[in-house]
Amino acid sequence: MTASENQKVAVITGGSRGIGKAVAEALVAQGIRVVIGDILDDDGHQTAQELNRQCAGDSQMVAYIHTDVTLYKDVIALFRFAEATFGGVDIAFLNAGIISGADNVFLPLEDEVEVNLPKVNITGVVKCTKVAVLHMAKRGGGVIVNTASVAGFLSSMQLAHYFATKHAVVGWTRSMEMLKDICNVRVNAVCPHWVATDMQGMILNKEGDDPYKQLVEHSPRVKMETVVRGVMMLIEDEKRNAETLLTLPGDVIRVQERIAEYEELSTPEYAALVDSYQPQVLEHYKKQLEHALDRYGL
């Protein structure tokens, strides 16, 4: 089944439950078709069936495909499946993430302890972005929203590894600002505080007598609807690009501004060089995009 040309299509990673599922529900409510990619196959199929049952008059608004975001073959299959099923991809909500192994400073000195968290939380976002951009560029543009976190601006010994991955997602998101001028693709990040999701449960179920659990148990929560509203703002407002949007307790949503540039890093001569460099690099990347599309087969 292929959607009509004016029908918007969204891809959601980690969409089987939690924030991803809530955003899928919001998108479907607006008539946007959704493809969920996840490794939780039972939950994924159940979520797709549940949302399809809610769509009166249209039996397939949501489809599911098994997706490991750390593998290019799975990510490519996800976006090609979305294109084959619904006609293209306009929106990508890159939400897949894990928190296990986050308190890693004194864990055993074993390689796998440090591998999985950044592999999913950072590399997964990078791989999905690269594939999403190609499909969106073919379609004339689109928008990507990454799930970062308030943790991307803070520090915590107890969850140091997790916090580091979310700092990386913030940096990656802001670094994609030029994509809008290259191929009309906007990239933003939603940065929630603690939500009552499965990931938070994983913290509370940590082994041992960790006093950090008490802090998490009593920490203020952000409502799921606040997070969803933030994601929808980033999708719908075409002026929002390379933006990091905090969603906080008390139904507060606000942009986390960047720090000011360090004046010591520039001179008048260097600033003039940067001004002349911008149009050159834009053309350079447009040519790289053409080569990437040819290489990918779009």
PLM feature segments, named:
Residues 149:
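Residue(s) in the substrate-gating loop at a strand-loop-helix junction
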